[in-house]
A protein has these predicted regions:
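Proteolytic maturation boundary segments
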Residues: 26-67, 78, 109, 208-277
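Solvent-exposed, non-transmembrane alpha-helical starts
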Residues: 32, 85-89, 144-148, 186, ...
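Short beta-strand/turn micro-motifs at beta-sheet edges
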Residues: 5-9, 62-66, 119-125
């Protein structure tokens, strides 16, 4: 509980928080109320240190398989990407739509419609620092996990052989820009999205991303795909349902002080150096 309290005191402070008010309200009285409620909280003495390091580029494909009881199979592919404020994030958002959109995305057409998977979904994480993009396929127990994995990788890492088309780009941009327009017209959604942009550095990033999406070209998507969707930058995970998981039994750490308390050892060697003659 002490660790939890220390974490709370360090980060849950007004100087590390964002407050957004959305909808129809009276600005002066609202600001006065905010000042009344939060202004009384003293400024903390602690200093929030900036991140002092970052993950280096991945130097080889990684894979993890989890075998537990369950009803569905999963295979997922994750790639490291740039920070959400980077220009590449707009092209990555469009690529995620081209590949993972429903019902026109390549993965939906080549996996779901062909009964290789029940569902395929993209997860694009734009963070203040380097982020990642993930594509996950869900299978029932009768579908072939190895075949689904094969097709998933071919679609993701085969964009140089099967480039994005002008029609796909146009459709992706229309979908993304439509979502942005809907967000702008919904005060609650807009507040949430602006808070995400603030966490990434500035509220204006939300509108900058819109402008970047509007100006996307095919070459932008192909360049981003070539840089990020490669084996050396890939982490692949699979969930394999197993009725009886085979787990090693790992003993707890022992009390070493108690273990050696009565230890006598063997007869001591003679003092001094021992030389072979």
């Amino acid at each position: 509980i002490e660790n939890l309290q220390n974490f709370y005191r360090k980060y849950y402070q007004p100087d590390n928080a964002v407050l957004l008010v959305a909808g129809k309200f009276e600005a002066a009285s609202t600001l006065a109320l905010i000042q009344q409620v939060f202004g009384a909280i003293p400024k903390p003495n602690r200093v929030l240190e900036p991140t002092y390091t970052q993950d280096p580029a991945q130097d080889g494909m990684r894979e993890v398989n989890v075998k537990r009881t369950g009803d569905v199979q999963l295979t997922a592919v994750l790639y490291h990407t740039a920070a959400g404020s980077h220009v590449d994030s707009a092209a990555m958002a469009a690529l995620s739509e081209v590949l993972g959109g429903t019902p026109n995305g390549r993965l939906h057409k080549n996996m779901v419609e062909k009964k290789l998977a029940v569902n395929v979904s993209p997860w694009n994480f734009d963070l203040a620092e380097r982020g990642y993009v993930m594509f996950m396929a869900e299978l029932n127990k009768t579908q072939n996990l190895a075949e689904a994995r094969k097709v998933l990788l071919e679609e993701l890492e085969g964009l140089q052989k099967k480039p994005v088309t002008e029609e796909e780009l146009k459709r992706a941009k229309a979908s993304l820009l439509s979502d942005i327009d809907k967000t702008i017209n919904d005060p609650q959604k807009l507040a949430v999205q602006l808070s995400e942009s603030i966490a990434n550095g500035d509220w204006r990033l939300f509108f900058l991303q819109r402008d970047r999406i509007e100006n996307l070209k095919l070459a932008d998507l192909q360049s981003v795909a070539a840089n990020y969707f490669k084996e050396s930058n890939r982490t692949l995970g699979q969930f394999i349902p197993t009725a009886t998981p085979d787990r090693s039994k790992l003993p707890d750490a022992v009390d070493v002080a108690k273990l050696v308390a009565d230890y006598k050892g063997k007869a001591a060697a003679s003092e001094g150096e021992v030389f072979d003659i």
